[in-house]
Amino acid sequence: MIFRDLKEMGILGINNRVGRYILRHNKRSMYPLVDDKVLTALRAEAWGIAMPQNYLIVENYGSLKNLHSKLLNYDSFVIKPANGSQGNGIIVIKEIIKEEKDGEIRLLCRRSNDKLMDIDEVKHHISGILSGLYSLSGQSDKAIIQAKIDKHPIFSNYSFGGIPDIRVIVFEGYPVMSMVRLPTKNSDGKANLHQGAIGAGLNLKDGATNNAVIRNLVVDCHPDTGFKLSGLQLPFWREILELAAQCYDMVELGYLGVDIVLTPDQGPILLELNARPGLGIQIANLAGLVPRLEKVRLEAPKNLLAKDRVKFSMENF
């Protein structure tokens, strides 16, 4: 009974996602461009697509010796694994505290949750990243020290601590579904659904929120701010969808998750890409992916520019 109901709603399951869409539409040879955030950044730069600036790439344990002096150049930053997933291993440093004593500068890092880390703790965390603790494959990895992005004022009342991001599912270059992920206290200020962030579905026609869930349970208000979650209208909506559509051209993956952040000064910029995007976006939108994917497969024109593909999506979904 439940299976039939889900099928009638057009809900895409894990097996069909892999068999009908990922395996058929994603070239394995292109996966490194998406899985490795360092390669993604290089590709995006070549395509003129804005991303957060990478300050440092830590590739081996020897590089940790000079880390202290290098971090003194920054007021804030983000540490993330190059090949991580689901937000694991990411630490946001919102403030660098520099204390001078006996001619030496001591460095303390204040995290987004206000906890302090000294330089040895930072090195220890990066060592874990290098060992592959957070990587998709479990193999050794690189650590990225990246510019911290400021929160767009539209989210002031809808986010606890961290920066919300926007997930767009793109199929053969056409945006088919989207949601905004809003950090909560329970998610430790991270826009991560698995850790307790809010997933709020977005109407493709106008970028307004239509429904919201926490751990698959429908919610009406943000648990930490009390603000109502429905009807939030995102600015730069067409630009957000066009950026997502352009990422298909950039990496040539037919079934793609595109994560975008809204910045106060640059507008929408690319955060990262995902070749195996999760299915929780359907619950956030109370809608199934299958009808939209099949409409693109059967009816969408081929060889259109990104802006024209976005026009089709906004009119049909």
Sequence positions of predicted segments:
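A long amphipathic alpha-helix within ATP-dependent nucleotide-binding catalytic cores
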Residues: 130-161, 185-263
